[in-house]
């Protein structure tokens, strides 16, 4: 049996994780700023998550949501103070793309309209509906025709928002475009977007699969912009390392959904509910959101101090512990050098080194990562100069 590698192979066999670190099969320790593309924001093998999962495993592991469970009730109680504004309802799923699919379906049903608007350089997933609102043609074109009609507007361009009209069911937006280069939305753009969707009766869907649950220094990244969306997708960090996603909805939308409108065999399973319960406790008890905000500013400051003299560094940007270093060249060489220096990061867009650090990252870790990034970028510059 052969494993089909659909992601780039990093050439490492990882056998253990703890907090902000992972170890390979030879025992080499790495600082993990990749975190499974942002999943391990609460750290690898978080003790409270393990405790809740272990306890639940002794009782029951899987069950249809047709049946109630005490752990789901506990999860709802613990998550309640963290829920997005005015969203008292949740659909429980497994992966980010599932949450996006549910959001698109919900928007079409609620509005009775078909047209969806997304943004250039967006990424929302690889299943058929989510792929339809993902910009990268390399992902989309082999599988077309997909869901339609879908129109892509320019991110952060207020003038183009006039294309959101009375035929639009929903607009889906990332508050920070992660896959495309850690590009934050402008506040005036987000406010104009909210105003235009309300004006024409379209739903505003904020995709927070990567940005949500504390990573950007707010529980939800939309809170940086002074708006409230109609629907919000969450995933990655919300399960503390366990596969969970969710669609959050306000009452006025939830009350219009009927049995059979959506479903998920594993969604809301007891193990997932245990993971979200624990993750919610960690977020509150460890002041994770505040830590992400403070540490993110420290990290960006250190990066700027270490990298400001390098001519190929264009910009260091992001919010909280979602940080991008834009350089003049593709980051493959730099990422390999960083890996050799025992720091794991990942690519974003065509020229960005992306850091998705766990909240327990220390200043010493930040120094180590910044030094590794410097070495990697210098190596990139040298090789580019030669070739």
Curated annotation (Swiss-Prot):
N6-(pyridoxal phosphate)lysine: residues carrying this PTM: 236
| Mitochondrion is among the record's keywords | no
User: Superkingdom, according to UniProt?
Assistant: Archaea
Q: Which InterPro entries match?
A: AcOrn/SuccOrn_fam, Aminotrans_3, Aminotrans_3_PPA_site, Class-III_PLP-dep_AT, Class-III_PLP-Dep_Atrans_LysJ, LysJ, PyrdxlP-dep_Trfase, PyrdxlP-dep_Trfase_major
Positions contributing to substrate binding: 126, 264
The cofactor required is: pyridoxal 5'-phosphate
**Binding of pyridoxal 5'-phosphate: at which residues?**
96-97, 123, 207-210, 265
The SS bond pairs are none
Record's subcellular location: Cytoplasm
What's the name of the protein?
Answer: [LysW]-aminoadipate semialdehyde/glutamate semialdehyde transaminase
Q: Origin organism of this chain?
A: Sulfurisphaera tokodaii (strain DSM 16993 / JCM 10545 / NBRC 100140 / 7)
């Amino acid at each position: 049996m052969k494993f089909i590698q659909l992601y780039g192979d990093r050439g490492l066999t990882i056998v253990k994780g703890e907090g902000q670190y992972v170890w390979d099969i030879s025992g080499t320790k790495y600082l993990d700023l990749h975190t499974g593309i942002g999943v391990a924001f609460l750290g690898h093998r978080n003790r409270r998550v393990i405790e809740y999962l272990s306890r639940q495993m002794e009782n029951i592991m899987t069950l249809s949501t047709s049946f109630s469970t005490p752990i789901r009730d506990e999860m709802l109680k613990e998550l309640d103070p963290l829920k997005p504004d005015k969203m008292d309802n949740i659909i429980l799923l497994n992966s980010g793309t599932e949450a996006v699919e549910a959001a698109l379906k919900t928007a079409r049903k609620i509005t009775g309209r078909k047209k969806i608007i997304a943004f250039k350089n967006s990424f929302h997933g690889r299943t058929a509906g989510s792929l339809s609102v993902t910009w990268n043609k390399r992902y989309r074109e082999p599988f077309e025709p997909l869901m339609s009609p879908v129109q892509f507007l320019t991110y952060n361009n207020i003038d183009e928002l006039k294309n959101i009209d009375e035929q639009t069911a929903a607009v889906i937006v990332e508050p920070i475009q992660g896959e495309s280069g850690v590009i934050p939305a402008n506040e005036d753009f987000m406010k104009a977007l909210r105003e235009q969707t309300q004006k024409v009766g379209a739903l505003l869907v904020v995709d927070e699969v990567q940005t949500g649950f504390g990573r950007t220094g707010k529980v939800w990244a939309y809170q940086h912009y002074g708006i409230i969306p109609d629907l919000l997708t969450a995933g990655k960090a919300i399960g503390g390392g366990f596969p969970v996603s969710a669609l959050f909805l306000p009452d006025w939308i939830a009350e219009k959904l009927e049995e059979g409108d959506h479903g998920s065999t594993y969604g809301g399973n007891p193990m997932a509910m245990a993971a979200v319960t624990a993750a919610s406790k960690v977020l509150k008890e460890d002041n994770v959101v505040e830590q992400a905000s403070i540490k993110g500013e420290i990290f960006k400051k250190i990066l700027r101090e270490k990298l400001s003299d390098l001519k190929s560094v264009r910009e260091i940007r992001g919010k909280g512990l979602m940080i991008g270093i834009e350089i003049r060249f593709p980051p493959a060489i730099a990422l390999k050098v960083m890996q050799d220096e025992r720091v794991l990061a990942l690519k974003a867009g065509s020229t960005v080194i992306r850091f998705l650090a766990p909240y327990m990252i220390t200043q010493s870790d930040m120094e180590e990562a910044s030094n590794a990034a410097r070495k990697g970028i210098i190596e990139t510059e040298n090789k580019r100069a030669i070739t």
